């Protein structure tokens, strides 16, 4: 205890910031110094589920006790800087209380706000207080569940990270209004709930944006229905983000569409899992991508003609085989990626019918004769098309160093599995250094 007491205030505050707020306040009992030391901690976390009545058996959290604790904690820090406020609230929370707490934090120079509702039955008036939308110091805003109602007057000039999980929106334009008010935003994460069946109109014109993620709610099964497949989607995407490095879009709603891609020329890593009528407008805008993961379902894919090597920087390609269009897409990407080094083929989702037909390229793609080194094939089933593709790669990839296969049948016919692996082992390989691995 003596050794801790001799630490500098800055170091001691850093140590205390890793504790929960209740534990931090209890340190006041340790010594006279700690009575004021906790006031220097720039981070406060409050969870109403930890405030239970002192009775046996299951009880709802004592919200009155929790509210008094938060009030006391915030008001006792008058004049002190509060950098981070984390509120984890249940169904008993009051909008008026949230407005007061966030308002106090804004006046104390709030830099990071995390607000999470643990219950789907959040208050109807659960929108954020107006003072937050003009907070000049706010850098990080993370919201989970709740209701977003963005006022006309909004300016978040310092906000760099915005995370919205399972949110409901007051109208179609409120999200656009919020994004337009964040001139230095660098990271945007949006996760839609399975209960949200409407499409979001996305117009993202953010010169500083570096990372963009749009995902459905984490998969849950209800009566055999995968709700992540029917969550809301993106409609009419407009994207102008010249600083964007990482792009991750998962939208299987069938609502996905692209209106205009102005500039995403800096993207180096991208994941696209979308059901769309014409996904190539987005795909072929990724001119600088080095690593791409694709699961595309399209009624029609029109591959650009006359562009030459569209993906001249692409080093790693990952393709999902669940959609019937995957093989045609894969061959086109081989032809358009002269520097490709690594390939991963995987069945990430249930297979759709009909299955693709193998059409050998008219000429050998340049990457097969100059750069492709590794192949990883997960969920290899030994179908006719898969055999044709693997044989073609073995015969043409002169730089192959390693090809690994994981069989689809983990508990199926052992003889069929053995025969499938033997066929792969006996396939002629043009590369003398190619190592064949079976997992």
UniProtKB/Swiss-Prot annotation:
Domain FBD: 358-406
Gene3D superfamilies assigned to the protein according to its UniProt record, in alphabetical order: 1.20.1280.50, Ribonuclease Inhibitor
Domain F-box span(s) in chain numbering: 1-61
SUPFAM superfamilies, alphabetized: F-box domain, RNI-like
Signal peptide as annotated in the record: none
InterPro entries: F-box-like_dom_sf, F-box_dom, FBD, FBL13/AtMIF1-like, LRR_dom_sf, LRR_FXL15/At3g58940/PEG3-like
UniProt protein name: FBD-associated F-box protein At5g56380
Taxonomic placement: Eukaryota, Viridiplantae, Streptophyta, Embryophyta, Tracheophyta
